[in-house]
Each structure stands twice: as C-alpha cells, then as structure tokens.
Amino acid sequence: MKKKQLKPEPYMMNRELSWLKFNERVLNEAGNPRVPLAERLTFASIYQSNLDEFYMVRVGTLMDQMESSEVVRENKTNMTSKEQVKAIIDATRELDIKKAVIYEQLMGELEPQGIRIINFNKLSGKEGELLETYFDNEIAPYLSANIISKQQPFPFLQNKEIYAVALLATKGGKTKTAIIPCSNNVFKRLIDIPTRPGTFMLSEELILHFLPKLFKKYEIKEKSLLRITRNADIDTETIYDEDMDYRDAMENLVKQRKRMNPVRMEFSRKINKKLIAEICKYIHMDKNHVFMSRVPLDLSFVFAIQNYLRMQGAEKEKLFYQKRSPRMTPQLKEKESLIAQIEQKDVLLSYPFENIKSFTNLLYEAARDDSVVSIKMTLYRLAVRSQIVDALVEAAENGKEVVVLVELRARFDEESNIEYSRKLEEAGCRVIYGLSGLKVHSKLCLITRKTEKGLEYITQIGTGNYNEKTSTLYTDLSLITAKQEIGKEAAEVFACLLRGETIEETHVLLVAPKCLQNKVLDMIDDEICHAKNREEAYIGIKINSLTDKVIIEKLVEASQAGVKIEMVVRGICCLIPGIPGYTENIKIISIVGRFLEHSRIYRFGTPEREKIYIASADFMTRNTIRRVEVAAPVLDDTLRARLDEMFDTMMKDDEKGKELTSNGTYVNRRVNAEKLDSQELFYEMAYKNAEKKTI
C-alpha cells in the first residue's frame, strides 16, 4: 500500500532551493552598481565557488540518496531526492543565464578602466604571431594530449580542473575523441598581450585555438572546454570502524574523495551531442547534469585582474572598498596584564571590526604566566600560519598542560587539521579527535589558573573559528570572561569530551547535542506564555541558517501566540514569514555585504528580563542535535546593551539587508532616510572607539 504523503505547510521552504536563493543574493552583489567594480569581480567568483561546493556536497548527497532502494523525502516540503535534484538543475540553468549577463556587464565596465579579456580572433596578425610563439615555447611543452582508444583509455578528470576536448577526424573519415588538461602550475592562466597593456587572454582559450598544432594528422571537427564537479560527500563516520590510527584513516578518506563520481559537467560552448553523450558514458554522467556556459569555467582569474588594477596606482583605488583594518579593542589596555583586566570585567570582541590579536595575546600571556596550569581548546578551521597554534605550542613547551580537540572532519580543511594535529602532538600537547557520530563545532577555550583562592578559570566562547585570516573577513563575536560559573561548566564540557562523551545537563551554557535545542525551545515557550498573558514578548535571532524543523514549528507557534520575532538569517531559511495565521509576526532579513555574516546571537524577552547568548550553533538539525556546540550567556549589562544595539542596527540595514517576503522572494527595503550599511557603521564605530579608547 502506497504511503500517503502529507501536504507541506505553507510556511516551509525547501532547504536546497533556499540555499540557491542565498547564492543568487551573492551574485546580485556582482551586478550591484553601488559595489566598487573590482569588488564585484570577487562576488562573481564567490558565487561560482559557492555553487561548486554546493554541487560537491549537497547534490552529491542527494545523488547518493537516489541510489538507495528506499525513496528519501525532505521533511519540510516532502520533495524526493530526485525532485530536488531536478529543481536544483532547473534553478541553476536560470542562474547561469543571470551570471552570463552580469559577467558581460562587468567586462563592459572594465574596458574604460583599461582591462579587456579577449579571444584569439580579436588579435592583430602580429599579436597572433607573438602568442603562437608563446604557446610553442611556454605552454605546448607541458601539455599531455590524449586520443581515446583501446590502448589509451579515457583519462581520469580531476575535480574542477579545465580540459580541452575535441572531436578529431582522420583522412578516412573516422572520428576520435581527444582530451587535454589545461591546468598547469608552470604557465600563467591570464596571459598578457604584450602590445596592449591591460589586455589578456585565458590560457585555456589559447590552448583551444592551437589544438590543430597538437593534432596535425587530424581535422578538428568540434572543440570546447569542459570542467567537471565531483561528489565530495565522504562518510567520515567510517573512520571509527577502521582498524588503524584515526588520523591515517582520515587521510585515506580525503584521498578517496578526489576519485568520487561526477555530479556536474560544464562546457564553454555548444558541442556535438554525440560527443557529449560519449563523454557522459566514459565518466558515468547523466546528460541532464550537463551545462553550457557563456562565462569562463573558472572565475578565479579575477583576482589576478584585481592585482593588476592595484598596481596601476591611486587612480584605481576607487574601484575597491575603502581600506579598513581591525582596531585593537579599547576594552583592554594591551601593555597591561590581560588576565588581570579580564578578572575585573568581561570582554566582547567583534570581528572583523576589532582585532583577534587581543585573544592571541591572551593565549601568549597564558603560555608564559606561572599561575596558568592548563589551556584546553577546540579547533575547527585554522589559518595557514596560525598564531593560535604557535601560542599553544609555546604553552606546552613551557610545561603547561595543553589539551586540544582538533576536529579532523572539518570539510575541506581535513588535510590542514591533520598537519596541525601532528605539530601540536610533537610539541607535547594532548590531542584528541572528536566524538563518534558528532562533529565538535564549538569554539571554546578554557584557561585554568592556580591562585591563592584555588583554581580559577578564564573562558572564551566564540561564534567563529580560531582563524586570524577569516577574522578579518567574517563577522564574529568572541566573549572572554572570568565568571567562574561559566568556567566551571566549560571545564565539565572538556571533561566529557576527554571521556568521549557529551555533557548531559547544564545550568549556564547551552551545549548541543543534549542541552541546546531543548533549552532554546523552553525560552521560546516562556515568550509564548508572556504573549498569552497579554504581556509584551520578543525573540531576536541572528544565525547563518535555519533548517531545524522542531525550532521552526515552535517559532510558528510563538508567532501565532503574538510574540514579535525578528531574525537575521544570512543563508538557508526554511521558514517563510508573513503567512496569515502562521507567521505574520515574524520578520526575516538576510545581509550579504562586504564581510561574510557569521555571528550567532539569541535574544529572548523584553529589555527588563532579556536573556541574550552568543553561539557557535545555527538552527540547523546538524548543529542542534548532531554536533557539539556551545552558546554562552552574556551577563555583563554593558555588553548586553552593546549586543542589543548591534542586533537592532542589523535589523535596520537597508543597504545590504534584503527582506524575505511571504512568497519566498527577497526584496530591497527602505527603512531609513539615508541607506544604512550595518557593517560599514560597525567599522566606523570601531575606529571612533579606538581613538577615544572607550566602547
């Protein structure tokens, strides 16, 4: 008997389609004339790299589900995996059209700035000769041409690499397929045209033009560039079943990912359908996953264009954002003991507006302070040259107990984390690797000191990674406190992790997987009670993604009870506001601006009874019940007021903030007499506060 499918609720949106709407907002910034021209190139490249990762991970997962004998349905809209993949492909084709229009606009606007990307047919005869010589001497010697035959099977295509493909014809009329890798670290991707400064040609286009030189015995019947995207959704839980070192097993899995099945293939121009079918057969690709692109298959070359523009001097500065650098927080006097100051008052750092150096300086001070007996820390994504790691190494070398939980399963950072785990172990740190079935995504650091009063704690809880690079690019919050009730509970969290367990009960912190979702639901229930008693009730949430169905349903219940709900959700949002009878008391905006919005703030209650937290967790099921996450209450009145002001400012952002409407679209909004960019305002405030030495 066929299972009856429930009708989806009118306030639910599919997760994957919501993500595509987010990436469209990124693409819109590439076409936004209010964004400096060179920065719009960055948004175009980010859009493409985001989409690559989406196909590698999300589409890869859905395609794995399609292989299952059981039909898997998404729990909010009841779409099957197959239906979702089709909807994703259809939406991607629409976005590809928009991307091509925006790319052509960008290229058109770059021309008056002296920048042109051209094809070979735009060259003069002399220029063509120069580039032919360049091809013969600098590119051709490094190319490996493959003509497919029984003796030379179809080569393995690397993920996201560009290849030239051609249909060759012999004098006797037989056809053969040829494929040539175009990516090589030896030659440049962006080739200068010597006679025309600022004019460039992409190396893959030059290779494509000179294919006849590589296949002199054949006629080139068809030619194109292609690029494939491979599934990257590896099952990291299998490493717990391996009878080998955890780190070695993880290295093996990362190698395995490079050879997984393709999920998408892109061509740079229309090409013979039979040739497409042949390539699809070779790589086991569904022809519905083939895309034709009017835009270069890899947009990372735009950063070379930006570098060229920067070298042109001051007149090109207007093409970039105004230079900004993080300020040292006025909350701390850098020449005095940071530990002593934090004992007196809590500190809240706001990145990228304030410098992460205040935290790294604290770690170095702890590494050298005789009263410090241990430092415990969770690490998820680290900078290439990490001062955080250097400080921990110094602490271990100074005889401190240093315990570090390195999450090796941080997607696409596995290899970096493996190397850092070795470095920490070699320095004498105790390194552990997370829990079976649960990623440790929390941002938690505990410094333990032995004083005359006994053991005392300094705790840091953050919303973002311990990464000096991303702290200048992402908005994040970092609370540093000497409140002992927070420190004692953080110590319990680490004790559980060291035993391979998760904490069962908390009183101050919210800790997933067992003590976060339920406590959030309780606080929403409290607001529902106030609303039902005809008292003012309020919930304010800032997160990156909202997919947790349990929390969504509870927010709908709160809206129906009359609770005012304001949300800043940067990316995926499966909740549609403004639906009569369900979500008319919910307002949701998304901010996509210069910096990646990454901080998480939870607010419950009116000012006189407000509870406010910063957290590492989004409201996604993976965060609330399948990861170790930590949210910390902000107890200092000054810091609470500062967070309230930040949240309220973001809700007023009508420069980068787009409002989610009841029909599931995002629209521009007008809130202020003059448009307000919250990120720009926060930077201005950081500069002023640093000058005044007050906050």
What does each of the following model-derived ranges do?
Residues K549-V556:
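Glycine/threonine-rich ATP-lid/beta-loop region of ATP-binding domains
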